[in-house]
């Protein structure tokens, strides 16, 4: 799930138009080393200017969909479009993940989450967060919950 705001002229951005036309998209997880390139790629480029090239990034072919992914991303999710919802000047896209791409250094018997620190956008045009303040908590079982209530 993610949303795309309209451009400064109130028109849908290329990203929204491309998703609507193709019925698919890729979510590339952004880490600190990719943040500046991501910020460049978010500019309102004209349709004839490639954001990836402008940001110094590279495209890699996807496996299950035609839309390429970002080579430099440590995690990419290939998605088919499930639904859209217009929310004012934003379009909310809900997709079904059909393929995961995860960098080798993050893979083992379990995902090595401590080696991965994606950045999240919280809203507004410029508010982001880091995912470095983490903690573990054991999941309670139903039997434990029932015993304590």
Tell where the protein language model's regions lie, with residue ranges.
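Basic, polyanion-binding surface patches
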Residues: 1-149
